């Protein structure tokens, strides 16, 4: 299969079940919502060494669609362990959103997806030291926590669902600039898919990994040498000088598949892309096999 002359390898991405939360962060302006978002999604690329996998889902939610009538941004936070995810929700909303000027936090999990919930707002309300108040806003139970700025408003409970983590594809290009241009185009396309996010820096992985190590038994992961252009015995097609990986997490398999589809299509429209592939473990580890050819 080819798209715009770019080979699409007959392979699949192996993805996993993961617990997901979805948070709407609003503020007095989109600028301040984004500042809170960047803090709340920080150090959230991969659970290989990060405490969660976090990123932006919807980069702009207009005031008419938010509970408090202010501009907002929707983020997603994922972890393979539900208790760890609940802890991350508490930590990230408490330390990164409550501390951000004018920011508020609301549950953004669709009711149809919600499997469980955690009373993050209730837990955070104790920061108010007895001065906190329970209230209702736009039909939602919220807590008003007094802070030196005024009040921090946070929804009482946040929904949790079983989503999908680790959807992926590789962009193999004839040069680093060409690869980066294609990867940026892919991420821009993925931003338009609701319920999916790319947790790595700018949505792009520059140092794709493999499980374990050939040389060091203490490593949980090491460089994917088969795709490293500077390694002499790599497995790259002729002419490939750079590889970027795009990793996608989502609320469900459909969102991840759609994000992969539009991302691959966008990448293939850019010059200098040689091949699109994907990472898997032979179907031995993940619950999902997303075959590239089936996306089109």
Swiss-Prot record:
The keyword Cytoplasm belongs to this UniProt entry's keyword annotation: yes
Gene symbol of the encoding locus: ftr
Pathway assigned in UniProt: One-carbon metabolism; methanogenesis from CO(2); 5,10-methenyl-5,6,7,8-tetrahydromethanopterin from CO(2): step 2/3
Activity regulation field: Requires high salt concentrations for activity and thermostability; 1.5-1.8 M KH(2)PO(4) stimulates activity while stabilizing the enzyme.
Protein name, entry field: Formylmethanofuran--tetrahydromethanopterin formyltransferase
Description of pH dependence: Optimum pH is 6.5.
Alphabetically ordered keywords of this record: Acyltransferase, Cytoplasm, Methanogenesis, One-carbon metabolism, Transferase
InterPro entries in the record: ForMFR_H4MPT_ForTrfase (IPR014053), ForMFR_H4MPT_ForTrfase_C (IPR002770), ForMFR_H4MPT_ForTrfase_fd-like (IPR023447), ForMFR_H4MPT_ForTrfase_N (IPR022667)
Keyword Ribosomal protein recorded: no
Catalysed reactions, semicolon-separated: N-formylmethanofuran + 5,6,7,8-tetrahydromethanopterin + H(+) = N(5)-formyl-5,6,7,8-tetrahydromethanopterin + methanofuran
GO BP: methanogenesis, from carbon dioxide; one-carbon metabolic process
Classification via NCBIfam families: one_C_fhcD (TIGR03119), PRK02114.1 (NF002554)
EC number(s) recorded for this UniProt protein: 2.3.1.101
């Amino acid at each position: 299969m080819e798209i715009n002359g770019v080979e699409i390898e007959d392979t699949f991405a192996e993805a996993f079940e993961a617990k997901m939360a979805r948070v709407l962060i609003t503020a007095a302006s989109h600028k301040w919502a984004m500042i809170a978002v960047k803090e709340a999604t920080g150090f959230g690329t991969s659970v290989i060494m990060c405490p969660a996998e976090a990123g932006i889902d919807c980069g702009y939610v207009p005031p008419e669609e938010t509970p408090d009538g202010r501009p907002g941004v929707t983020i997603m936070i994922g972890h393979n362990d539900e208790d760890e995810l609940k802890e991350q929700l508490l930590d990230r909303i408490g330390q990164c959103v409550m501390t951000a000027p004018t920011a508020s936090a609301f549950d953004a999990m669709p009711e149809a997806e919600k499997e469980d919930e955690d009373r993050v707002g209730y837990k955070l309300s104790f920061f108010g030291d007895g001065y906190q108040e329970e209230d209702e806003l736009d039909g939602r139970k919220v807590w008003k926590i007094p802070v030196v700025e005024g009040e921090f408003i946070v929804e009482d409970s946040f929904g949790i669902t079983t989503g999908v983590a680790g959807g992926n594809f590789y962009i193999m290009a004839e040069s680093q600039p060409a690869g980066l241009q294609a990867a940026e185009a892919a991420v821009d396309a993925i931003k338009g898919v609701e319920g999916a996010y790319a947790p790595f820096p700018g949505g792009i992985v520059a140092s794709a990994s493999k499980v374990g190590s050939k040389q060091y038994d203490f490593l949980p992961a090491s460089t994917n040498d088969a795709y490293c252009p500077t390694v002499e015995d790599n497995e790259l097609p002729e002419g490939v000088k750079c590889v970027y990986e795009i990793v996608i997490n989502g609320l469900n398999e459909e969102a991840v598949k759609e994000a992969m589809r539009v991302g691959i299509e966008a990448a293939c429209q850019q010059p200098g892309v040689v091949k699109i592939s994907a990472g898997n473990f032979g179907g031995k580890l993940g619950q999902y096999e997303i075959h590239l050819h089936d996306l089109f």
